[in-house]
Curated annotation (Swiss-Prot):
Active-site residues, record numbering mapped to chain: 122 (proton donor)
Lineage: superkingdom: Bacteria
InterPro entries per the UniProt record, alphabetical: LytB/IspH (IPR003451)
Name the record gives this protein: 4-hydroxy-3-methylbut-2-enyl diphosphate reductase
Species this chain originates from: Campylobacter concisus (strain 13826)
Molecular function terms, GO-annotated: 4 iron, 4 sulfur cluster binding; 4-hydroxy-3-methylbut-2-enyl diphosphate reductase activity; metal ion binding
Binding-site list for [4Fe-4S] cluster: 12, 92, 186
Sequence positions that bind (2E)-4-hydroxy-3-methylbut-2-enyl diphosphate: 36, 70, 120, 158, 214-216, 258
GO biological process, one term: terpenoid biosynthetic process
NCBIfam families given in the database record: ispH_lytB, PRK01045.1-1
Reactions that this protein is recorded to catalyse: isopentenyl diphosphate + 2 oxidized [2Fe-2S]-[ferredoxin] + H2O = (2E)-4-hydroxy-3-methylbut-2-enyl diphosphate + 2 reduced [2Fe-2S]-[ferredoxin] + 2 H(+); dimethylallyl diphosphate + 2 oxidized [2Fe-2S]-[ferredoxin] + H2O = (2E)-4-hydroxy-3-methylbut-2-enyl diphosphate + 2 reduced [2Fe-2S]-[ferredoxin] + 2 H(+)
Binding sites annotated in the UniProt record for dimethylallyl diphosphate: 36, 70, 120, 214-216, 258
E.C. no: 1.17.7.4
Cofactor note: Binds 1 [4Fe-4S] cluster per subunit.
């Protein structure tokens, strides 16, 4: 059986940057998981004493606090800056962008629509920067019945599917007088999704590696599943099952933006032994 990696996969710029920031900081606490990958979070805690807290209220004797890649709410950031703790910002610059857009557009009188998961930390942070009406949706149907102002601004969670974002934009174009569309989907997300789709079209089995709480990894899995029925989402090589590969000729592999190369290599090595 041949094993082929997608042409684009794994660690993105924002995650690489955040990992380096955390390693350089050492002896610190992150506000929420730095990234959505439990294996890498454990490595940072073990090797660099970077622990994970659920929120700013858990800070006690820490000297340094690292803001996660997904960002935190505007209010939490303001509260954090009132303390004597050194604040180290590892928010991905691609996440900072929709935060700034929401703040600016709401100040200019626009209603703001965020395409994304309202429970995701990135979306919670982005939403907190809007000062007026703000709506978080995943489906066009959720927009029905909303009485918008004349002006609406649309942004996206950075890890969503472009096609779905365009559907939301098209709906709004038909229902509001003025629409500002800001494509805030990360380029790395788009490239990884396209690469996974192209590989899944040819593969007999697809393995998607990443945190099961990771939005971009889930999107990769769903895209892969559309084109390759035998697609599986795993966090480590321990989840692989021999039966998945029976009678298969091509095994495709992709990985989420928070998945380090060392985990990917472990999966590849295990599959080679099947």
């Amino acid at each position: 059986m041949k094993i082929e990696l997608a042409s684009s996969y794994g660690f993105c710029f924002g995650v690489k940057r955040a990992i380096k920031i955390a390693e350089n900081a050492g002896d610190a606490a992150t506000i929420g998981p730095l990234i959505h990958n439990n294996e890498e979070i454990s490595r940072l805690e073990k090797n660099y004493n970077v622990k994970t807290l659920e929120g700013i209220d858990e800070l006690k004797d820490e000297k340094k606090a690292i803001i996660r890649t997904h960002g935190i709410t505007k209010n939490d950031l303001a509260e954090l800056k009132k303390t004597d703790i050194k604040v180290i910002d590892a928010t991905c610059p691609f996440v900072t962008k929709p935060q700034q857009i929401c703040e600016k557009m709401s100040e200019e009188g626009y209603d703001v629509v965020i395409f994304g998961d309202m429970h995701h930390p990135e979306v919670k942070g982005v939403k907190s920067y809007a000062k007026g009406n703000v709506y978080v949706v995943l489906e066009e149907s959720e927009l029905e019945g909303i009485k918008f102002k004349q002006k609406v601004a649309l942004v996206s969670q950075t890890t969503r599917k472009v096609e779905k974002f365009m559907q939301i934009a098209n709906y709004l174009m038909l229902h509001v007088k003025e629409l500002r569309v800001f494509n805030t989907i990360c380029n790395a997300t788009f490239e990884n999704q396209e690469a996974a789709k192209n590989l899944a079209k040819r593969a007999d089995v697809m393995i998607i590696i990443g945190g099961k709480n990771s939005s971009n990894t889930k999107q990769l899995y769903l895209i892969s599943k559309n084109f390759c029925e035998d697609s599986y989402l795993i966090e480590s090589e321990e989840e692989l099952e021999r039966s998945w590969f029976d009678g298969k000729n091509l095994c495709g592999i992709s990985a989420g933006a928070s998945t380090p190369d060392w985990i990917i290599q472990k999966v590849v090595d295990r599959i080679k032994k099947v």
